[in-house]
Amino acid sequence: GHMSQCLSNSVLYNYHHLGDAASLTDGYHYDPSLKPYQVSADGKRSGTPDDMWAFTSRNPQLDLRASTMLAAASHALRGYNDDLAARALKQSKRLFKEANELMAKNPRPQGRGGMGGSNAATNLQLYVATGEKHYIEDFDAQIWSMLDMNVNFGISTALDAIPYMNDDYKTKLRPYVEKYKEYIDSLDEDNPYGVPIGLGNWAGSGNVVSFGTTVSFASQYFPDIISKDYAYKAMNYLFGCHPYHNYSLVATVGATRPKAVFYGNNRADFSFIPGNVAPGLLFRHPDHFENYDDWPFLWGQNEGTIAGNTSYVIF
């Protein structure tokens, strides 16, 4: 198997469905020979065309991301669930091999979205999971061109590698951290909060969380260059110091008042799930930020996601 490009609703009813996602479909495979709501005698098929659509065209970049995550999961699971750890590592290696074979047939430029950046992170996690030296050697050969192309994108992966590299690596990384420091200082000129505020169609608290995590590790390894105070800027923004209602964007956490309405599994109740992190303040051209706390269905402002919540836990 491989990563799917998309899993999508096939009918409008599914799209605006509220409540438990387990009831999104009837749980039967669609059979057009049956009438709507009719269930086959064997209890496996129905005449209701509500099956989800999986788009199965293969993107090796998605496979690399999956390989990275599976390798990291394998390392974390070892000693707790060894069978699952072994299965995760096996699939990580398989996806890594197959993705590289596919990309060799259709090469893409190095850098963000290209094989260089993705491979560096995957090689690092596979080394952590296996201890096999060829992975860390490949990582070391790839990370520097990745940083040269875009230090803001690559610095987090580079910092993750410090515990597994020698002192020469940290010395070589130092000027890149200094360059990253120039970027984070420039944020004070962009906005009064000193964090990367997104201006796209999806609100930008995810960028703020990632920024906070990166500067936290940078201050741990290079405290003479980057102060931990930068991480507090990210925390302040998430917990309410932002240009709208000053509510915390994290459910149940925050000094003034946490947001009480999120787009999640209980969105029909105009409620929240503790720990949800909202995308936050959506920029409306030409000069307005907004985050509605009385209407959950604007998912670009209010949706709590697994990826976003996990990133916050790490931060």
List PLM regions with ranges.
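Active-site acid/base region of carbohydrate-active enzymes
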Residues: 1-45, 80-96, 100-114
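Aromatic (Trp/Tyr) and acidic
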Residues: 9-65, 69, 120-134, 138-141, ...
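Aromatic-lined, polymer-binding surfaces characteristic
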Residues: 59, 63, 67-77, 85-130, ...
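Acidic, Ser/Thr-rich low-complexity linear motifs
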Residues: 108-113, 193-201
